[in-house]
Amino acid sequence: MPSLPPEMIVLLAPFVQLFSDRVWRHAQVLVVGALLAPGKRTVTSCLRVMGLSGERHFTNYHRVLNRAQWSTLQAGEILLGLLITWLVPPGAVIVLGADDTIERRSGRKIAAKGCYRDAVRSSKKHVVHCFGLKWIAMMVVGPVPWAKRAWALPFLTVLGWPKAKARRGRHKTSVDWVRQMMKQVRHWLPERLLVLVVDGGFAAVALALACQEQQVTFVTRLRLDAALYHPPAPHSPGKRGRKPTKGKRQRSLKIWAARSDTPWETVDVDWYGGTRKRLAVFSRTALWYTSGVAPVAIRFVLVRDPAGQLSDAAFLCTELQSSPEQILAWVVMRWSVEVTFAETRAHLGIETQRQWSAPAIARTTPVLFGLFSFVTVLALRFCPSGQLPVETTAWYHKAEATFSDCLTLVRQQLWRTWFCTPSPLSADLAQFPREAFECLVNDLPLAA
């Protein structure tokens, strides 16, 4: 294995404890190969770009994923610590984003494969289903020095099984997984202020109650026909029967949106793309209730676009003292989760893996998601000032650095560390290493 940049060695050092010495040597090759390999992120493509095309014991590298003993949960805890250390100021609120995504896969031997709705290809009138794996990812959402918008950095990813193939007779929905992951993060960070932001698919009273029990602020989209209630009236002394948990039902948000006397307030909020936008909001507190579950106290925000470009929408927050501006700022940050899913597919080879064994499947995709966060922190280590070099062309002007620029910077530093050794100041000839020449001519031009 060639030498690595000192900045990368520092970030990799905490992960050494997860592996034995022999497995760690092979794991490093796969991690660096996944960063350098163009196109598919298979084990063989990682070996090829590392100059190990002639490695006869290539099965040892496959065993890192399908047989070796190590925990993705412990790796997620270590990665979360790195993200907080390098990107979250001390004492600041940690915003968490969670969502599920479908990795399209086919094959009879893939046990966790199911048929799911394809959110990317589907519309309101036309629903598209596909076979694949459902992944639920939790990310740290926050600012990075080189971008105006927040970035979502994955650190914990789990595989959701379809209901027909649920193991041990119990099926966990995406909401169940997010609740369990949220409790795990609270166990890791018992003293920090946490905010969990999810989309409308996770708008469940049970999840809101779980967040409230763990002292985690819960933010999500709210249906306009949601059942909202007033607090219960004081219980009369000596009155028999169970104490009421809710009072009279409040006016529906649909009615509030349709009324002409709704007391709208105008606010300027942080918007997508790092801009500002003026919106009209109406905010109150209520009890959110669904049958079979205890009601939870929330602050709802009904939002209207004065320009008429957006339809009315509502959002909720379990922190009753939060302002509408703060709630909407958290809601806008959630879109970075979708951007991360798209970036990992475009640049890290999500959906190009070819493993079929259950342990390898359960590890490969979480590792690739984790590499997104690892590359981001590593780019910050290479450029402490936050001024990343941006790749521009005559026909395309990029205003700020993106993940592709981070990955380009990391690759450049790796190649320079390996092959660009300093030459004497008086030298007339700089010799190009043969290993670099063979990689440039034979490996990098291979089709993706």
Model-derived features with residue positions:
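Short coil/turn segments at secondary-structure boundaries
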Residues: 26-28, 43-47, 76-77, 341-347
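Gly/serine-rich nucleotide phosphate-binding loop at the start of the catalytic core
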Residues: 1-63
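Active-site-proximal, Lys/Arg-enriched surface segment
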Residues: 67-157, 283-287
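Single, function-defining residue in the core of a domain
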Residues: 1-15, 19, 77, 108-110, ...
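Short alpha-helix boundary/capping elements
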Residues: 35-40, 51-54, 69, 105, ...
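Generic alpha-helix structural propensity
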Residues: 26, 38-42, 56-60, 70, ...
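Conserved short loop/turn motifs at secondary-structure junctions
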Residues: 31-34, 64, 194-201
